[in-house]
Amino acid sequence: MQNPQNLIWIDLEMTGLDPDSDVIIEMATIVTDSELNTLAEGPVIAIHHSDEVLARMDEWNTRTHGNSGLTQRVRESKVSMAEAEAQTIAFLEQWVPKGKSPICGNSICQDRRFLYRHMRGLENYFHYRNLDVSTLKELAARWAPDVRDSFKKGSTHLALDDIRESIAELRHYREHFIKF
């Protein structure tokens, strides 16, 4: 069911914001058609890291990932970074030809930085373009704050939830902000 018009949505949870010193601890993907209808949800993967790595998280990440249960899932996971990358690529190959979909999500440049540093094969699977919902959020904040404020996110900071919210947010901006 590969279609070059399908869109790949991805979200990563990390131990921090610096791809040189922090690591990916969770990833998820969703493939939609060009109209933002979900076609398939990819694997949701907690990536194993040692307690030593997890101990380097700052207070915000320690609290957030601890409260969501992600830290415990990372400790219990048997999946390595390389295995997570391979599983994700295998899923994407069923839906989108390599190099066709932009990387889609919220503040997606940050995810792309981590993929470039830690999962180069997956980063190379995407087209070089980005479809970043946060661009519309920033424009709406300046040009139509009521439109931005009328969309509320749950902010669970779990990868699959974050992707679902990003897709819903783009639908919101398509309906209320983008004029055809």
From Swiss-Prot:
One of its GO terms (molecular function) is nucleic acid binding. The active site is at Y128. It holds the Pfam family RNase_T. It is found in: Cytoplasm. Keywords: Cytoplasm, Exonuclease, Hydrolase, Nuclease. Signal peptide: none annotated. InterPro entries: Exonuclease_RNaseT/DNA_pol3 (IPR013520), Oligoribonuclease (IPR022894), RNaseH-like_sf (IPR012337), RNaseH_sf (IPR036397). It is an enzyme of class 3 (hydrolase). Its main location: cytoplasm. Its EC number is 3.1.15.-. It comes from the Bacteria. Residues 7-170 form the Exonuclease domain. One of its GO terms (biological process) is DNA metabolic process. The keyword Nuclease applies. GO terms for cellular component: cytoplasm. 3'-to-5' exoribonuclease specific for small oligoribonucleotides. NCBIfam families: PRK05359.1. Belongs to the oligoribonuclease family. This is Oligoribonuclease. It comes from Pseudomonas entomophila (strain L48).
